[in-house]
C-alpha cells in the first residue's frame, strides 16, 4: 500500500507480510555491509530495528552516474524513474534523514542534493551546509516524490536534469 500511495504500483519486491500487515523493508548499508533496515508500514509510518546503526547508513541505487543524495526511499524511486526516462545516469544515495546526508556526503565527489522542502527548513539548511548544488520543490511541505505525483515524471525529470547541468 505504501508504494502504491507513492505512485509505484506493483513494486512488491521488498514487501513482507507481518501480523496481517504489509511492511516495506529497505536495507541500510555502511561500506557495502548490511547494518539494518528501515521498516515502512502500509500507513507510511517508519522505524528502524531496535539498536541498529543508522549513522552513515545508506541504500545506494547505482547506475554509474553523478552522486545524488536524498532522504527517503520513495523520493529515490521518483528520482530514479524520472532520470531513467530522461536517459540520464545516476548514483542515488538514500540517506534516511537530512542529518545523515551530511555524513554520507563526506568522502564523495560533489553531486546533487535532493532536499525536502520542509516547513522547518531543515532540508534546505542541510543542503546548504553540505555545499553541493541542490534541488528542492518550490512547494513547502513537498519532497521530490510529492512533486512527481503533482506534476508528473516528465516535469520532475526536466527539472532534475537542469539542476544536474550545474553539478
Enumerate the language-model features and the residues they cover:
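Phosphate-handling DNA/RNA-contact segment within nucleic-acid enzymes
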Residues: 19-108
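Broad hydrophobic/π-residue packing in well-ordered secondary structure
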Residues: 1-5, 49, 112, 144-147
